Amino acid sequence: IIINTILLINAISSVDDLIILFETKNSINISGYLNTKSQIIIDEKIHKGNSYQQSLVLDDFFDVSDVDRFKVIHRGGSENNLIYILGEYSSNTDIYKVLITLTKSEKELTIKKIKIDKKL
């Protein structure tokens, strides 16, 4: 029980760290949670690639959308070590819905998908 609690605390801390990276729009460090199987989907366009290429996709989104705030709406987990974060990026004129899904192994969190859609 103690080991499971320690693993859960470490995973929660890592999720909190990841949320801070999204709040600060730190695409380079966000890309450290990505791998070549990860997807970034922005307004239905799917982006794949290595972590550097994916960091450029996020940089482009941050520059073009001019978002300045990230707010977590809900976060949770499910069976099979799947963790999700629902959030919103907002600018002065637009709001973007964000869904981040992650998998947790014994040693790390990996982003499976980042889905960003402009709210109409």
Residue ranges of predicted features:
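Surface-exposed, charged secondary-structure patches
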Residues: 55-94
